A protein has these predicted regions:
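Adenine nucleotide-associated cytosolic modules
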Residues: 1-168
Length: 168
């Protein structure tokens, strides 16, 4: 999700962007991730995406963080630059919640992608407040953690109302 979002934002003509990803491209990513090609196997995902974005827009001011955002590091990153918007495509619960919480606390608009595993029907994809999600285990877990931090609503998310297919 993150690479697709970054590419579309880049193509729309954004001037400044920061991308964060500590993963490396591996073969199991080829069926679903934009930077995953046989020629990029084993390469850092953030670097592959960065090259692609700069090839699209060489004037893009691009920050590249080849790391996983952890608690205090998230605070550092959000404090170091004035961000107009955050696109969250993190698939790990704690870093996702921490990013959403700190963006919310700083009044940085955000949109967050929730889980899509074992879901096949694109007609059931919705955008709604985190408080209005259903049939998404990741959204439920994020909602619970955010409530524990005092955030009950105010974070838009992309999720699917489809019930996950256990055979998928």
């Amino acid at each position: 999700v993150g690479a697709y979002a970054a590419e579309q934002i880049c193509r729309a003509g954004i001037g400044h962007m920061t991308i964060v990803d500590a993963d490396t491209v591996n073969e199991s990513n080829i069926n679903r991730q934009l930077p995953a090609l046989h020629s990029t196997l084993g390469m850092p995902t953030a670097e592959v995406v960065a090259r692609r974005l700069l090839d699209i827009n060489p004037r893009l001011k691009l920050g590249v963080l080849n790391e996983f955002l952890r608690d205090e590091r998230t605070e550092e990153v959000l404090s170091a630059t004035r961000y107009d918007f955050v696109v969250d495509a993190i698939d790990s619960l704690s870093p996702k919640v921490f990013l959403l919480y700190h963006a919310y606390q700083r009044n940085i608009p955000v949109v967050s992608s929730m889980g899509a595993g074992a879901k096949m029907d694109p007609s059931q994809v919705r955008i709604a407040d985190i408080s209005k999600t259903c049939n998404c285990a990741l959204a439920k877990a994020v909602r619970k953690r955010l409530r524990g931090l005092g955030v009950n609503k105010g974070i838009p998310v992309v999720f699917s109302t489809e019930i996950a297919n256990p055979d998928a």
